[in-house]
Amino acid sequence: MEIIPAIDLLQGSCVRLHQGDYDQVTRFSDDPLAQAQQWVKQGATRLHLVDLDGARSGQPINDQAVRLIAKELSIPVQLGGGVRSLERAEELLSCGLDRVILGTVAIENPELVMELASRHPHKIVVGIDARNGFVATRGWVEESEVEATALAQRLSKAGIAAIISTDIATDGTLAGPNLEALRAMAQASEVPVIASGGVGCMADLLSLLALEPLGVEGVIVGRALYDGRVDLHEAIQAIAEGRLQDPLSDQSRTIA
């Protein structure tokens, strides 16, 4: 299972939102490239970028930072947030990104997902962000009537590389991933699933190993890394060794 550090970009800075709320912002760094290089130094094999400005408004405010990171890093970089057209997706891929993540457009224009997946094999990922089992769009500001698992089942047949499953209720809370929702997503999907949201300690990461046989092949970690609750290098080693344990019996689940 791959541990993927996240850098969320808002007006050029590295931030985290609490449960997707743009009014609850924690800023961690004003130098996204330096932060990205730090994760590489600690052993990251892939980097996950989120353009929060793009997700909310569709404006490419963070493109300078994105292009610099894609150019300078020696590992694959993927980006989501505001990718809602064929032109935008191809522009990002041409600047050196390994993958682009489609969110809102996957509901509003599923034909575009299929076209991009056909034109760019292994480069297109769908991000399914869910609140109470239903997909949220446009930077989590709007909610749809589409069930997350139904969307996963449908789009996983479109030739995409993977699905990123984000549980909004746990994102940025450090309260632990929603294992039940992830299990349902993995069972519905025909492509690998990457978990996102809620990881607060090493035990949370290890608990995800139980879902690996179902197709959960990666996990995106944000706030727990920035808060120092998870050491990236140690986590990568632990996952590689497959140290599966019962998270309920692990003292490290306490986040207070």
Curated annotation (Swiss-Prot):
Enzyme Commission code(s) on record: 5.3.1.16
Active site positions, chain numbering: D8, D129
Pfam hit, one: His_biosynth
Organism superkingdom: Bacteria
InterPro entries: Aldolase_TIM (IPR013785), His_biosynth (IPR006062), HisA_bact_arch (IPR006063), Isoase_HisA-like (IPR044524), Isoase_HisA-like_bact (IPR023016), RibuloseP-bd_barrel (IPR011060)
Coiled-coil portions: none
Pathway annotation: Amino-acid biosynthesis; L-histidine biosynthesis; L-histidine from 5-phospho-alpha-D-ribose 1-diphosphate: step 4/9
First-level EC class: isomerase
Keywords of the record: Amino-acid biosynthesis, Cytoplasm, Histidine biosynthesis, Isomerase
GO molecular function: 1-(5-phosphoribosyl)-5-[(5-phosphoribosylamino)methylideneamino]imidazole-4-carboxamide isomerase activity
Catalytic reaction equation(s): 1-(5-phospho-beta-D-ribosyl)-5-[(5-phospho-beta-D-ribosylamino)methylideneamino]imidazole-4-carboxamide = 5-[(5-phospho-1-deoxy-D-ribulos-1-ylimino)methylamino]-1-(5-phospho-beta-D-ribosyl)imidazole-4-carboxamide
A single GO BP: L-tryptophan biosynthetic process
Localization terms from the record: Cytoplasm
Main location: cytoplasm
Family, as annotated: Belongs to the HisA/HisF family.
Protein name: 1-(5-phosphoribosyl)-5-[(5-phosphoribosylamino)methylideneamino] imidazole-4-carboxamide isomerase
Protein species of origin: Synechococcus sp. (strain CC9311)
This protein's encoding gene: hisA
